[in-house]
Amino acid sequence: MKYILFLFLICVSTLAAGELKVVSISPALTELICFLGKEKLLVGRSEVCNYPESVKKLPVAGRLAIPFVEKTVGLKPDLLVANDLVNPGVKAALERSGINTLVMPCRSMADYKKCVEVLGKELNASEAAARELERIARWENKPRKKLDLKILWVVWDTPLLTPGRRALLHDIIVKTGAENATGEFDQEYMRPSFDKLLKKDIDVIIWSASSAGWKQRRVWQKFSAVQKKRVLEDLHQDSLLRPGPRLPEAVDNLMKQLEKWSAK
């Protein structure tokens, strides 16, 4: 009798997970849900959730971290998945409508691993989650050679914004074997002065800002990285800036691009 009851509970649990309807308004978490083999559960996305390509056919239920309450409620999801930038008042409104809201920070690889674990349990994808955690562990523990490069990663230029050591971009630079030029600051992002940066003898500039013609500005012409044409601008932003399944490969590709300038 106990064995029959056990089988019944397993079937009910599996059925419940199979019928779950999910809205994700975080691009990184949308990618993760699909990577875990649970894309079929998605009934809505944010307007910036664009990978894999197949999710673009889903209804748009919000912007990044901003769910459209009426639209989301109309999709009748059981669960909304978002990062921790969601307004608490909006979260409360959705929960009053009967929608469970799972809010998780997703700013680092440590956050990503926690998201893998949590979504693995919530979406009945524990085996896929375990495989992903093993894959990430192998990647993190892989031997890497040190690159003799000091990197300035420009997130924005007006005002100037660069990563401190709490930022995902700092982790990425370190994983390539290089040094983050503004990694001594114990914060996520910072606004350094040009005078201090010029004293650091920057080897490479990674440019994620959208400004055109920036290299012609007099202040940037003073950097040896610009003078030597050691600038990376055409990186695949989504795979690098989202802590998700594609990040390890994106970091390895970045490392290969940086290697040509190491020890030169």
Set out the residue ranges of the language-model regions:
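Sec-dependent N-terminal signal peptides
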Residues: 3-12
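Boundary at the C-terminal end of the N-terminal hydrophobic targeting segment
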Residues: 15-18
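Structured C-terminal subdomain patch of bacterial secreted/periplasmic proteins
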Residues: 20, 110-121, 130, 141-143, ...
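Basic- and aromatic-lined ligand-binding clefts that recognize polyanionic substrates
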Residues: 20-33, 127-176
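A short, structured surface patch at a secondary-structure boundary
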Residues: 21-85, 181
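His/Asp/Glu-enriched short active-site or ligand-binding loop at hydrolase and phosphoryl-transfer sites
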Residues: 46, 168-189, 209, 233-234
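Short helices/loops that flank or line small-molecule/ion binding pockets
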Residues: 69-76, 97, 191-201
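A ligand-binding cleft/hinge motif common to bilobed small-molecule-binding domains
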Residues: 86-96, 199, 204-223
